[in-house]
Amino acid sequence: HTDSSAASDVYKRQDPLYSPTRVLTENFLKDFNIKTTFYNPHDLKTLEKSITKKTKLIFVENPGSNSFDFQDLKKIVSIAKKNKILTTIDNTWGTPYFLKPIKLGFDMSIVSATKYYSGHSDVMGGSLAVNKKVFSKVKAAERITGLRLGPDDAYLITRGLRTLDVRLDRHSENAKKVAKFLSKFKNIKLLYPYKKGSYNFKMWKKYYSGASGLMGLKIKCKNINSVRKFVNSLKLFGYGYSWGGFESLALHQEYRETGTRKFLKLAKDEHLVRLHIGLEDPSDLIADIKQALKHLK
């Protein structure tokens, strides 16, 4: 979660954070005299303590990018309202189908339309939902900056939205079956709301009506080449970053920076692999993962 504000404003955000968002806040916003500070998503006291009179916005990513940490959303909204601070959430993972942030009290909710809204990996775009309090300011900014989708992109996203519920139900159903299979392996820590009793599961269950298809795997393996072979030997999974389409994807996040590994709580011999579970037959996906796991030594 992030808290950022300019010379007179600070912007609060969580850590870890989606890397392009991190670059935006750390490298781009500072040129506009906007300062960004971080808080621990599992310890919201760090958020409360870091708020100052200059804090203008709290930015939430739920779940956290690659960490898959879920937060207590109502508590964040409560902290923000108490201090008269605006709140924004990145709701790309859940989409409004599984989570409705504005109803929870958030001022703004952003979703990457490139992903589940489109559903076919053929569009680049985004959406912003806001409450009545900030609508006029956001609308004015939109007119000034010229944020308009092209007609073709708008058409393709509208097409995708017509099947959003059907697709997300299938993504969720498939991901749950894959998660159940992967949970049996002692050398794999599943980053997905599957393990009952965990803090992340409780926070997911408290606010979401379902789970989408993106998950992370913390794989304990001394040989990084074995992890690479595991990913490269998957036959039904494409290799790519932009998830949310109909197809399954795998990505080996080869983090080498000490800071990033610390943020993601990656041990020395742990490696992060991200899977997006698509709309294929779940038994085929599980069989594919099973044959690829033989490369982990």
Where do the model's predicted regions map?
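Active-site PLP attachment segment
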Residues: 102, 106-164
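Structural signature of PLP-dependent enzymes
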Residues: 159-181, 208-212
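PLP-dependent aminotransferase-like
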Residues: 8-60, 78, 82
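PLP-dependent enzyme catalytic core of the Aspartate aminotransferase-like
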Residues: 19, 26, 35-37, 49, ...
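Buried hydrophobic positions in well-ordered alpha/beta secondary-structure cores of metabolic enzymes
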Residues: 11, 58-61, 76, 90, ...
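Single conserved hydrophobic/aromatic residue that forms the stacking wall/gate
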Residues: 1-7
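Active-site core of PLP-dependent enzymes with the aminotransferase class I/II
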Residues: 63-86, 94-100
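Conserved C-terminal alpha-helix-loop-beta "cap" of PLP-dependent enzymes
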Residues: 190-273, 277
